[in-house]
UniProtKB/Swiss-Prot annotation:
Its EC number is 2.7.6.1. Keywords: ATP-binding, Cytoplasm, Kinase, Magnesium, Metal-binding, Nucleotide biosynthesis, Nucleotide-binding, Transferase. This is Ribose-phosphate pyrophosphokinase 3. GO terms for cellular component: cytoplasm; ribose phosphate diphosphokinase complex. The gene is PRS3. Pfam families: Pribosyl_synth (PF14572), Pribosyltran_N (PF13793). Pathway: Metabolic intermediate biosynthesis; 5-phospho-alpha-D-ribose 1-diphosphate biosynthesis; 5-phospho-alpha-D-ribose 1-diphosphate from D-ribose 5-phosphate (route I): step 1/1. Disruption phenotype: Cells fail to arrest in G1, cells remain budded and a significant fraction has a G2 DNA content. In such conditions, deletion mutants have a disorganized actin cytoskeleton and actin accumulates in one or two intensely staining clumps per cell. Deletion mutants also show defects in ion homeostasis and cell integrity. They fail to grow on medium containing 1.0 M NaCl, 5 mM caffeine or when incubated at 37 degrees Celsius. The caffeine and temperature sensitivity are rescued by supplementing the growth medium with 1.0 M sorbitol. It comes from Saccharomyces cerevisiae (strain ATCC 204508 / S288c). InterPro entries: PRib_PP_synth_CS, Pribosyltran_N, PRibTrfase_dom, PRTase-like, Rib-P_diPkinase. It comes from the Eukaryota. 5-phosphoribose 1-diphosphate synthase involved in nucleotide, histidine, and tryptophan biosynthesis. Active in heteromultimeric complexes with other 5-phosphoribose 1-diphosphate synthases (PRS2, PRS3, PRS4 and PRS5). One of its GO terms (biological process) is ribonucleoside monophosphate biosynthetic process. PROSITE patterns: PRPP_SYNTHASE. Signal peptide: none annotated.
Length: 320
């Protein structure tokens, strides 16, 4: 049964997405204070009563400070639980440790499962995320998980900002072929595939194009951009095969390491990321970066969850 009131919480840093969501819902972020003492320990307090309230905690987790953001989120969840909130939903658009979803070598942990366990132990009742790197992570939880998709927002962006009828959708690897094919079908476009062989993580040794991109605007789609070395090499391969131009659209712009340098020095015309990850400072250093705002999708998911409505509408449709 829906609760009587919504409370939105966000950490003191990287509140941009949370503020956009709150504005779309016509709400204010609930007063709270998160402090870090000289020893590095974190304390958190909520500035008003949340008893019997429907709590939504919105966090953006990017590169460099992942563990700090995770611990802050766990503390905020637990604080809400001990303050007698009726339901606590963690909105984590970029789910941390999603690439550690399986035991890929001896004595390796499955850290994505550990993340799920910690969230539920802290008191989380529901999780909303976006474009999980591995969809099976939903099965790690003992509470409901809604994995939203950036695809409707991406389709809208392409139709409004790209001459898409003269385009082709590109998958940067075999694993993303289904994503690329689905997007291509929605736009009634062809798609091509780049087969890549990795020498080690984040280092591609060879790339082979499967498909014809002659005189086409190539739109590379992926769930995550990390160091962007793969995207830069993909752009070179596509242009060598007579593509007209190349842009990349990714859900999670982690942009770690030399990502900005790689983008600036690449033959990519544009790299478009959603704001699941905070990268406002990086945009100032890279004129090729652009943003797709997904706050409307998150706001509508909150409204629907609070009112007991289906969220599956958002899997294929942009919020009205």
């Amino acid at each position: 049964m829906p609760t009587n009131s919504i409370k939105l919480l966000a950490p003191d840093v990287h509140r941009g997405l949370a503020e956009l969501v709150a504005k779309r819902l016509g709400l204010q972020l609930t007063s709270s204070k998160l402090k870090r003492d000289p020893t590095g320990e974190v304390s958190f307090s909520i500035g008003e009563s949340v008893r019997d309230q429907d709590i939504f905690i919105i966090t953006q987790i990017g590169s460099g400070v992942v563990n700090d953001r995770v611990l802050e989120l766990l503390i905020m969840i637990n604080a809400s639980k001990t303050a007698s909130a009726r339901r606590i939903t963690a909105i984590i658009p970029n789910f941390p440790y999603a690439r550690q979803d399986r035991k890929d070598k001896s004595r390796a942990p499955i850290t994505a499962k550990l993340m799920a366990d910690m969230l539920t132990t802290a008191g989380c009742d529901h999780v909303i995320t976006m474009d999980l790197h591995a969809s099976q992570i939903q099965g790690f939880f003992d509470v409901p998980v809604d994995n939203l998709y950036a695809e409707p927002s991406v389709v809208r962006y392409i139709k409004e900002n790209v001459n898409y009828m003269d385009s082709i959708i590109i998958s940067p690897d075999a694993g993303g072929a289904k994503r690329a094919a689905t997007l291509a079908d929605r736009l009634d476009l062809n798609f091509a595939l780049i087969h890549k062989e990795r020498a080690r993580a984040n280092e591609v040794s060879r790339m082979v194009l499967v498909g014809d991109v002659t005189d086409k605007i190539c739109i590379i789609v992926d769930d995550m951009a990390d160091t962007c070395g793969t995207l830069a090499k993909a752009a070179e391969i596509l242009l060598e095969n007579r593509a007209k131009s190349v842009i990349a659209i990714v859900t999670h712009g982690v942009l770690s390491g030399r990502a900005i340098e790689n983008i600036n020095n690449s033959k990519l015309d544009r790299v478009v990321c959603t704001n699941t990850v905070p990268f406002e400072e990086k945009i100032k250093k890279c004129p090729k970066l652009a943003v797709i705002d997904i706050s409307s999708v998150l706001a509508e998911s909150i409204r629907r969850l609070h009112n007991g409505e289906s969220i599956s509408y958002l899997f294929k449709n942009y919020p009205l």
